[in-house]
Amino acid sequence: MAPPQGKPENVLRLADELIALDQHSSALQSLHETIVLKRSRNAQGFSLEPIMMRFIELCVHLRKGKIAKEGLYTYKNAVQNTSVTAIENVVKHFIELANKRVQEAQEKADKISVEYVDDLEATETPESIMMSLVSGDLSKSRTDRALVTPWLKFLWDAYRTVLDILRNNARLEVMYQLIANSAFQFCLKYQRKTEFRRLCELLRSHLGNASKFSNAPHSINLNDAETMQRHLDMRFSQLNVAVELELWQEAFRSIEDIHSLLTFSKRAPAAVMLGNYYRKLIKIFLVCDNYLLHAAAWNRYFTFTNVQKPATANFVILSALSIPIIDANKLSGPSIEAEDAKSKNARLALLLNLSKTPTRETLIKDAISRGVLSFCDQAIRDLYQILEVEFHPLSICKKLQPIIKRLAESNDTAQYIRPLQQVILTRLFQQLSQVYDSISLKYVMDLATFEEPYDFNPGQIEKFIMNGNKKGAFSIRLNHIENSISFSSDLFSNPIKSSDSVSLQSTPSELITSQLTRIAKSLSSVLMRFDTDFCLLRKQQAEAAYERAQAGVEQERKAVIAQRSLLELRRGQADTLATQREAELAAQRALKQKQESEAESLRVQEEINKRNAERIRREKEAIRINEAKKLAEELKAKGGLEVNAEDLEHLDADKLRAMQIEQVEKQNKSMNERLRVIGKRIDHLERAYRREAIPLWEEDAKQQAEHDREIFYEREKQRKEVQERKHEQAIKDKKAFAQFASYIHAYKQNIDDERDKAYQEAYAKAKNVIDAERERQRKEIFEQKLAEAIREAEEEAARAAEEEANRELHEQEEAQKRAIEERTRAAREAKEREQREMAEKLERQRRIQQERDEEISRKLAEKAAARRANIGASSPSPGAWRRGGASAGGVSRDSPRYSRGGYSRGSVPPRETLAPSKGAYVPPSRRNQQQQ
């Protein structure tokens, strides 16, 4: 079908007619050829928009994603300079239709699943499961795969197509952001993790291309505040969806994207934006159990925002105190794990805009120096004082117990209790190792006692010690026989240094290591005290060094100035070269873009020509196949020739006739052969064969049954022998184990007694605590009710005083309002009186003027009557000749009345001669003339 050459209305009408005839493919092809026509590129956006809407509907109906993509690209190139709104409407309609089809498919699949379940209360049995597998019944997963998955794939392709069309266009930024957010919600709603990863990669590639082709027409400008904010909002939405889908690697890459955008921007980001950025980092680091960078993120967040400062300060100090002293970075000796941890933390620190990885002591010192502790609650300040300033291993747990209870009241602070306990245990063992060589495990358990559910058992303590030994923080050995722990003191081992712990005294290894240093310091102090020559020599050396330094200052200053000048010169040259290189790159990009545009146009034209040629070929092939089908039907009706539908594509009329002749010959041969075989088989030979074989089959069946019986008896005998041997062995095992039964029962009884005793003690202790807590709550409630009654009485008195004051103020306002109304009424009456007097004065003047006008009109009327009387007396008779001449009463041509100033015969007299009738209106100009 040739592409329509008419108006858009005709194209739509033709498409509607084809749709009505259920020829959707033909309608789609017609609209597609109209859109890709060369003259359609110069059309207006509003004229092509209805065609594009119908084209998109057909593409969605037939699930033709590639054709929709090509049409949308062509439409965008045609109207992007004239009508951006049209592009937005079309792509929005495309996404809405695809979403609608997915929802319809989901509803249909759910309906099929519900209809398949006959009994909602019936349970699955093995028989029903096997029957469903054998019969091939559709399950929900199969239904979804058959109905929903194709439309999900189409919707995903639609999102990718639209994002690729809208990318890196400053006019389509808002729609690009909306479609990207919609794609994020699509991945979240249908749990499409793979598609979400691909979507993130697609957005990253778009952003990379935007920075490469920044000089292209309509390219986005990341230096613009609104554009940067849109991309940051998209990345934050991407981060939220990654967290919801539990794709932590993608969440980390999203954080890196946000950091890259913030770094790329030449403008300083807003404090609110940085606050949101650091809040997300805080959550991610907490989920990853990276307490060091979690505390660093809280520190940065406190620096860049002032909202909720007391609450933020609490978390800054609490997170810093929760950083483990035993860190992966402090593993003893070179280790791949340690190097990986260091490089990972260094890379993560860059996301916080930190030049190097922070440490626990630097974070705490920085927070204290900036006065963060003054904003914290009293419990947090007490925690810092006990843990960092007044740490005492014998009473630390008892002092911290109320603070831990306070932290456990909130879910946000309760998550820091376990890391705080790790810090307490580390400090405890480090200081115990400085005082004791060996200590009982029970004593350590008493020192590290916390209330449930935060208490430690011996297994947890042992695991903690082994972890500390592994990372080089401890040198502790466990003795399970004596139930004690011993601290190793190798005199020649490297002493463990930790800036996070308080040194109570020097260890033997530290004394051995620092012995030479201490001797050198002592000898130096002795020489300084008793050897005057040595002191004089030191003084001379210091003076000589000072003179050398002073002499080299000027030379160094000149060298610095020269180096600075050289750097400025090189920087200027580098800027010039960079500008030239940028201009060359821009020219190359413009040329490349022009070549790509021309190549794209050529490709589209070749594609159109190829498609037209293919369409013509298909039409010719369809005509040939239709003719072959008609001939095949005729041959089938006449000669019974059956032709396969696939073979019709390679057959013509001559081949079909030859096939008919060959078919007739085959039928004749087959008929003759069947007649010959039937004649030969009229005897009963086959029946005789079968009768003779019956006894043989019966004998074979008897032999087979006998053989099977022998095999069965043999296997049964073997099975009995095996069972007897197993039974004898089991009896022997029972006799052997019976010797230990008494020991086992005694051991079990001891354990039960210990557990019962511990339970009774814990029960009594808990009961005492509960009774004390109830008494305390009762007192608190009584005090609260008493304070509330006092407060209500005070509020009632204050309310009565306030009502009295309001009443007096209201009375004063009413008095002032009445005074103002009196003055206003008096002024209004005076004004009305003046207006009445003025109206009366004007009325008198009007009557006087009216009387004068009537008098003047009367006099003028009398004069006019007299003048008319005079004119009537001197006028000629009606029958007199009026031509000028010597006739009586006439006027000669030489008379003055016939001059220019007079009036001719048959003309009306001048206006001055016409007096108005009595009572007629006389204008003021006439009045003046009449008075003169």
UniProtKB/Swiss-Prot annotation:
Domain of life: Eukaryota
Skewed-composition ranges (Basic and acidic residues): 793-865
GO biological process entries: formation of cytoplasmic translation initiation complex; translation reinitiation
InterPro entries: EIF3A, eIF3a_PCI_TPR-like, PCI_dom
Disordered, as annotated region: 793-932
Membrane-crossing segments per the record: none
Alphabetical UniProt keywords: Coiled coil, Cytoplasm, Initiation factor, Phosphoprotein, Protein biosynthesis, RNA-binding
Domain PCI: 309-492
Compositional bias per record (Low complexity), positions renumbered to this chain: 877-893
Molecular function GO terms recorded: mRNA binding; translation initiation factor activity
Subcellular compartments: Cytoplasm
GO cellular component: cytoplasm; cytoplasmic stress granule; eukaryotic 43S preinitiation complex; eukaryotic 48S preinitiation complex; eukaryotic translation initiation factor 3 complex; eukaryotic translation initiation factor 3 complex, eIF3e; eukaryotic translation initiation factor 3 complex, eIF3m; multi-eIF complex
Gene3D superfamilies reported for this sequence: 1.25.40.860, UVR domain
Phosphoserine sites (modified residues): 374, 501, 874-875, 877
Stretches of the chain forming a coiled coil according to its record: 537-862
Role played: RNA-binding component of the eukaryotic translation initiation factor 3 (eIF-3) complex, which is involved in protein synthesis of a specialized repertoire of mRNAs and, together with other initiation factors, stimulates binding of mRNA and methionyl-tRNAi to the 40S ribosome. The eIF-3 complex specifically targets and initiates translation of a subset of mRNAs involved in cell proliferation.
Subunit structure: Component of the eukaryotic translation initiation factor 3 (eIF-3) complex. The eIF-3 complex appears to include tif32/eif3a, SPAC25G10.08/eif3b, tif33/eif3c, SPBC4C3.07/eif3f, tif35/eif3g and sum1/eif3i. This set of common subunits may also associate exclusively with either moe1/eif3d and int6/eif3e, or with SPAC821.05/eif3h and SPAC1751.03/eif3m. The eIF-3 complex may also include SPAC3A12.13c/eif3j.
Family: Belongs to the eIF-3 subunit A family.
Protein name in UniProt: Eukaryotic translation initiation factor 3 subunit A
UniProt organism field: Schizosaccharomyces pombe (strain 972 / ATCC 24843) (Fission yeast)
